[in-house]
């Protein structure tokens, strides 16, 4: 059976991106590989063990996301507290929304963007979103 271990995104400012993911979501640096032309930094979520691989191609500062990329997602125990914390850090989360079907609440969430404009969904833990 396969195990999901990481997803990779390209970043324009490695230190800024690392700071964002560490500050916003508590990810920790688990591994780093530095080469002449690029660096790879793996940031781990200690709860799940999954990682985001930040790829910094030295000299490249901007990327396009194309039409295929949607978002990554994190769950939190207290969505309102996380929203207020990120707002206090001046990270500009979008307003909290509710997703319902036939009047039943399926999810509470908000979106935030990292320094390179990648969208991140933050969901209240519950139901399908564990």
Regions found by a protein language model. Give the residues of each.
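N-terminal beta-strand motif that seeds the catalytic metal site of vicinal oxygen chelate
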Residues: 1-18, 69-74, 123-130
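Core segments of cupin and vicinal oxygen chelate
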Residues: 2, 8-51
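Short amphipathic alpha-helices within nucleic acid-binding modules
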Residues: 20, 79-85
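Vicinal oxygen chelate
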Residues: 31, 74, 83-130
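Exposed loop/turn and edge beta-strand positions of beta-sandwich/beta-sheet ligand-binding modules
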Residues: 37, 68, 106
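Short, charged/polar surface micro-motifs in flexible loops or helix N-caps
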Residues: 46-50, 59, 79-81
């Amino acid at each position: 059976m396969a195990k999901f271990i990481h997803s990779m995104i390209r970043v324009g400012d490695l230190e800024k991106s690392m700071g964002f993911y560490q500050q916003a979501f508590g990810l920790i640096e688990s591994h780093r590989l530095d080469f002449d032309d690029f660096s790879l930094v793996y940031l781990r979520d200690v709860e799940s063990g999954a990682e985001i691989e930040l790829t910094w191609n030295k000299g490249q500062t901007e990327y396009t996301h194309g039409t295929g990329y949607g978002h990554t997602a994190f769950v939190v125990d207290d969505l309102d507290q996380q929203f207020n914390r990120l707002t206090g850090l001046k990270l500009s989360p979008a307003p909290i929304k509710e997703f319902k079907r036939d009047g039943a609440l399926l999810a509470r969430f908000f979106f935030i963007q990292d320094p390179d404009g990648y969208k991140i969904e933050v969901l209240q833990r519950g139901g399908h979103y564990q």
